[in-house]
């Protein structure tokens, strides 16, 4: 039984609440503390019902604890009674979370009744011990050609999705959730950190329509929430994912949108606690906070957690402390380009900017590595030739360069792919392409086996066989 103690509110400054406890009854750091109307002394009156969860962050001395609220502090006043629960925040975990929208405290916000929880876990958990972690590096097949070929994702790794508004980050996220659910039997957890409420609602609606909602848990800490909630919602999502990994033995995918807002929330909390700011005004514990979350994303012998994190880059400055700290943890970066989306090529992934740690012959094999580098080499040469083409035209190019341009344009279109979750918009059925077929298809294009096919044959198809079939249809 947790050691429950009682304190009294002495100060309220926005999201920060100071509480004095009796000597010897101080809560541990990270303990959950509640302030509720129902726990007050007789005679207490309030305009509205108060039910606020806080987390102990600092021990100030003189038996006073400084706490950060995870919910709005409206209605809290000096002299109110606070209850130390004797444990960290606990949330429901298990398959009952699938198809539901939860907040940072694990409370349902979708008006669909209580969560049918398998268990309740604390959100503050240690990462797996080194002996439990899976040493081998494996590729997680996504069925998305450009990702599997150019920037393969590591099972249990961390992927950064970089891109502006409207270039297709959400569609890639939905397709990954769908492919993991249908092709691998896995579950996904979507964690909205500082997410716009409208975007979260749109995502839920689209996932319900596309039929993947039953394989996904949605955890939201919207941008109107106090900074404490936005700082901890990532841990709530991780805890839900860890249960599936450790108890169901599954390969779980967790999405964090946006990891920058996680750092931003830590910045706000740090300032509220009175800490001296560090570089560019960020909290001095930025690297520690980031590592605390990221180190829990890993493969074990039971299962894996793979994360895809949207990364906002302030003022396009990659040296800003928030994205710079995130880079240190990423295994793969998928860069979405507006220039490619303007060509109508989706997913609009830039194959020259996207990278992966496991694009290595010892991991993916020589054929995969050589094919990926060959694709990048041709696309890079095409990029260099575009200025010449724009000024002088194609006729001034050598025969070799003309061939490179022709193949590059085919490869560029071949990197496009119809998605299952976008069927209602494109009218084309989605296609899942295994990595082996992707590598073989691009290998044949590089070898010149399909130089006779038109560029249109390669647009929005799956493997090379579907491109050949499309070419025959176009000729007919």
Curated annotation (Swiss-Prot):
It is a peripheral membrane protein. GO terms for cellular component: plasma membrane; proton-transporting ATP synthase complex. SUPFAM superfamilies: C-terminal domain of alpha and beta subunits of F1 ATP synthase, N-terminal domain of alpha and beta subunits of F1 ATP synthase, P-loop containing nucleoside triphosphate hydrolases. The keyword DNA repair does not apply. It catalyses: ATP + H2O + 4 H(+)(in) = ADP + phosphate + 5 H(+)(out). It is an enzyme of class 7 (translocase). It is found in: Cell membrane. F-type ATPases have 2 components, CF(1) - the catalytic core - and CF(0) - the membrane proton channel. CF(1) has five subunits: alpha(3), beta(3), gamma(1), delta(1), epsilon(1). CF(0) has three main subunits: a(1), b(2) and c(9-12). The alpha and beta chains form an alternating ring which encloses part of the gamma chain. CF(1) is attached to CF(0) by a central stalk formed by the gamma and epsilon chains, while a peripheral stalk is formed by the delta and b chains. Produces ATP from ADP in the presence of a proton gradient across the membrane. The catalytic sites are hosted primarily by the beta subunits. Belongs to the ATPase alpha/beta chains family. This is ATP synthase subunit beta. It comes from Syntrophomonas wolfei subsp. wolfei (strain DSM 2245B / Goettingen). The lineage of its organism: Bacteria, Bacillati, Bacillota, Clostridia, Eubacteriales.
């Amino acid at each position: 039984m947790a050691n429950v103690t009682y304190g009294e509110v002495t100060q309220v400054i926005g999201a920060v609440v100071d509480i004095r406890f009796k000597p010897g009854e101080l809560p541990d750091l990270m303990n959950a503390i509640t302030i509720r109307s129902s726990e007050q002394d007789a005679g207490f009156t309030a305009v509205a019902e108060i039910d606020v969860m806080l987390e102990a962050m600092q021990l100030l001395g003189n038996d006073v604890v400084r706490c950060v609220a995870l919910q709005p502090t409206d209605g809290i006043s000096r002299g109110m009674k606070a209850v130390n629960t004797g444990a960290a925040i606990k949330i429901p975990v298990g398959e009952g979370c699938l198809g539901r929208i939860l907040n940072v405290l694990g409370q349902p916000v979708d008006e669909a009744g209580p969560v049918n929880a398998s268990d309740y876990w604390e959100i503050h958990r240690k990462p797996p011990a080194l002996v439990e972690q899976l040493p081998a590096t494996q590729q997680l097949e996504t069925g998305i050609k450009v990702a599997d070929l150019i920037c393969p994702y590591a099972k249990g790794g961390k992927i950064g999705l970089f891109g502006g508004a409207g270039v297709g980050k959400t569609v890639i996220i939905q397709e990954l959730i769908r492919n993991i659910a249908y092709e691998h039997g896995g579950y996904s957890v979507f964690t909205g950190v500082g997410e716009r409420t409208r975007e979260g609602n749109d995502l839920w609606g689209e996932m319900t329509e596309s039929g993947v909602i039953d394989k996904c848990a949605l955890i939201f800490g919207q941008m109107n929430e106090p900074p404490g909630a936005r700082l901890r919602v990532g841990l709530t999502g991780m805890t839900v994912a860890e249960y599936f990994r450790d108890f169901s033995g599954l390969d779980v995918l967790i999405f964090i949108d946006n990891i920058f807002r996680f750092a931003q929330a830590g910045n706000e909390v740090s300032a509220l606690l009175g800490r001296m700011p560090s570089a560019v005004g960020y909290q001095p514990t930025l690297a520690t906070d980031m590592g605390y979350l990221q180190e829990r994303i890993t493969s074990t012998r039971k299962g894996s957690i793979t994360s895809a994190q949207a990364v906002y880059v302030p003022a396009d400055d990659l040296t800003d402390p928030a994205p710079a700290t995130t880079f240190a943890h990423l295994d793969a970066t998928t860069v979405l380009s507006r220039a490619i989306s303007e060509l109508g090529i989706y997913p609009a992934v830039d194959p020259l900017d996207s990278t992966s740690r496991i694009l290595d012959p010892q991991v993916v094999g020589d054929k995969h590595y050589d094919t990926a580098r060959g694709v990048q080499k041709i696309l890079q040469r095409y990029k260099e030739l575009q200025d010449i083409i724009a000024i002088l035209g194609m006729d001034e190019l050598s025969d070799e360069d003309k061939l490179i341009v022709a193949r590059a344009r085919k490869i560029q279109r071949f990197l496009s792919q119809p998605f299952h979750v976008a069927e209602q918009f494109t009218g084309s059925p989605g296609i899942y392409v295994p990595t082996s077929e992707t590598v073989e298809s691009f290998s044949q294009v590089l070898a010149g086996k399909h130089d006779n096919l038109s560029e249109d044959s390669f647009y929005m198809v799956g493997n090379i066989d579907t491109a050949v079939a499309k070419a025959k249809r176009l000729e007919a």
